[in-house]
């Protein structure tokens, strides 16, 4: 309970899954715009434009359709992914920069840790620093723990199948 008597509500979700692949193979997927689309379990990510991230500040565009969530009729729209944490083969995190104001401020990401048979992948979604206007709406989290867990399963399958394939 908080001091005001309200029950504390978590503002971050983390899920983990061991994947039988090295961190470089996994990072190649999670740092790639097309990789994001390939592994999305929410059904919102339709396609992408841009190059794989290589540093903090890099951006790429994801073409979205929120219809899969059946909550807000936004139709087709684009968001810009801006990388806020980048450690090659270890961690990547990003925020979403959209056309709406104020910017939301939620962060998504992956941490990769070597383990005996591959890599332990942690997927996280953090909305603790969202703008107060958005916090007051009570619509967070946008993505559920189940969706994060599903994305890790798809990531595992995607890496096992050899994505991304060399050109």
Model-found features: residue ranges?
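Intrinsic-disorder/low-complexity, polar/charged segments enriched in Ser/Thr/Lys/Arg/Asp/Glu/Gln
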Residues: 10-18, 59, 78, 91, ...
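Hydrophobic pocket/interface hotspot
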Residues: 25-30, 36, 60-62, 83, ...
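Glycine-rich portal/gate segments that line the openings of hydrophobic small-molecule binding cavities
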Residues: 48-97, 157-167
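Short, solvent-exposed aromatic-acidic interface loops
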Residues: 95-104, 124-131
């Amino acid at each position: 309970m908080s001091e005001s008597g309200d029950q504390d509500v978590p503002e971050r979700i983390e899920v983990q899954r061991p994947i039988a692949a090295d961190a470089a193979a996994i990072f190649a997927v999670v740092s790639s715009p097309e990789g994001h689309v390939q592994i999305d379990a929410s059904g919102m990510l339709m396609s992408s434009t841009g190059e794989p991230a290589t540093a903090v500040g890099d951006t790429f565009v994801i073409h979205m359709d929120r219809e899969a969530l059946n909550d807000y009729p936004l139709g087709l729209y684009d968001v810009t992914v801006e990388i806020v944490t980048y450690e090659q083969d270890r961690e990547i995190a990003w925020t979403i920069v959209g056309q709406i104001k104020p910017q939301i401020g939620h962060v998504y990401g992956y941490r990769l840790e070597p383990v005996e048979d591959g890599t332990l992948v942690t997927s996280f979604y953090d909305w603790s620093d969202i703008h107060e206007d958005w916090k007051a709406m009570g619509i967070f989290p946008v993505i559920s723990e189940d969706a994060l867990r599903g994305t890790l399963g798809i990531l595992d399958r995607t890496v096992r199948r050899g994505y991304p394939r060399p050109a």
